[in-house]
From Swiss-Prot:
Protein's organism: Alkalilimnicola ehrlichii (strain ATCC BAA-1101 / DSM 17681 / MLHE-1)
Domain of life: Bacteria
Name of this chain's protein: Undecaprenyl-diphosphatase
Main localisation: membrane
Keyword Transport in annotation: no
Presence of the UniProt keyword NAD in the record: no
Keyword annotations: Antibiotic resistance, Cell inner membrane, Cell membrane, Cell shape, Cell wall biogenesis/degradation, Hydrolase, Membrane, Peptidoglycan synthesis, Transmembrane, Transmembrane helix
Note: Bacitracin is thought to be involved in the inhibition of peptidoglycan synthesis by sequestering undecaprenyl diphosphate, thereby reducing the pool of lipid carrier available.
GO biological process terms held by the UniProt record: cell wall organization; peptidoglycan biosynthetic process; regulation of cell shape; response to antibiotic
Lineage, broadest ranks: Bacteria, Pseudomonadati, Pseudomonadota, Gammaproteobacteria, Chromatiales
Length: 290
């Protein structure tokens, strides 16, 4: 893989992993553009591309760790302190808040995993046509627009329960549909459950950590099954990793800026324009979708 292609794919991953617009649609567009230029790309299901996807996913994990480091550090300290206090009570009085949040996060991931493993193939088959992607992009824009019009939310961390965690986890699972965005779905439905904007953002992106780890593990298993590719170069992997991490930090901070100020609708105009271009054929996804 050429270094400039690795850098470009790292940029796409870093931007659209966090912006509330579809990463799938943009990866397809990028691959289509590269193919139209006469560039040779390995098939998406090849060991080379799976390994590259694994590496850039880890790069976006670094982005989350950098941006949310203060919150992650606070969470860890409070979890350790709460566990010590809970043990001192002999395990009485219920789980400490931060341990409860940890297990609720795992429940969200479980909901995502069950839905994803059950319906992923169906989503990719039924929703992989350009017209269906245009439809899911339009839905994303509507949800983002509606989110900005919601009254101020009042639910804090203590208000997160199994129902809230389940709703957010299922929303993340439905984001496997081509044209839907993981960050958009989790943030939007977190707000719909009543979470304040700050906690909706933090829960959404904290949830991305175990989700990305699980996806990375599945990708690693697939690479092992297919055999480590000989055609992928360390330099291309390194470039993709570094670019995805740096660009991811910028895009993550941008999302937080707009979310806190109830301005996610600026992304609505973009995804609607993209949906219109795909629906009318001005943007042709058919060759890349096969």
């Amino acid at each position: 893989m050429a270094l400039w292609i690795a850098a470009l794919l790292g940029v796409i991953q870093g931007i659209f992993m966090f912006l509330p617009v579809s990463s799938t649609a943009h990866m397809v567009l990028t691959e289509h553009w590269l193919i139209a230029r006469g560039e040779t790309l390995p098939p998406p299901e090849s060991a080379e591309m799976i390994l590259f996807a694994l590496v850039v996913h880890v790069g976006t994990l670094v982005s989350i760790a950098v941006v949310f480091w203060p919150s992650l550090w606070r969470f860890s300290l409070n979890a350790l302190g709460g566990a010590w206090e809970w043990a001192g009570r002999g395990g009485r009085g219920g789980l400490p808040l931060y341990w409860r949040l940890f297990w609720l996060g795992m429940f969200s991931v479980l909901c995502t995993g069950v839905l994803g493993l059950t319906l992923k193939a169906t989503f990719e088959h039924v929703f992989a046509s350009p017209l269906m992607i245009a439809g899911t992009l339009t839905l994303t824009g509507i949800l983002l627009w509606w989110t900005d019009r919601l009254a101020p939310r009042r639910r804090g961390l203590k208000g997160i329960n199994l129902k809230v965690a389940g709703v957010i986890g299922l929303a993340q699972g439905f984001a496997l549909m081509p044209g839907l965005s993981r960050s958009a779905m989790t943030i939007v439905f977190a707000l719909f459950t009543g979470l304040k904007r700050r906690w909706a953002a933090e829960y959404s992106f904290f949830l991305a950590i175990p989700t990305i780890c699980a996806a990375t593990l599945l990708q690693a298993i697939e690479v092992y099954r297919l055999g480590l590719p000989n055609t992928v170069g360390f330099s291309a992997l390194a470039v993709g990793f570094v670019v995805a991490a740096i660009v991811g930090i910028i895009s993550l901070k941008l999302v937080i800026y707009f979310l806190y100020r109830a301005r996610l609708k600026v992304f609505s105009f973009y995804v609607w324009a993209l949906a219109l271009g795909i629906a009318t054929g001005l943007i042709d996804l058919a060759p890349a979708l096969g």
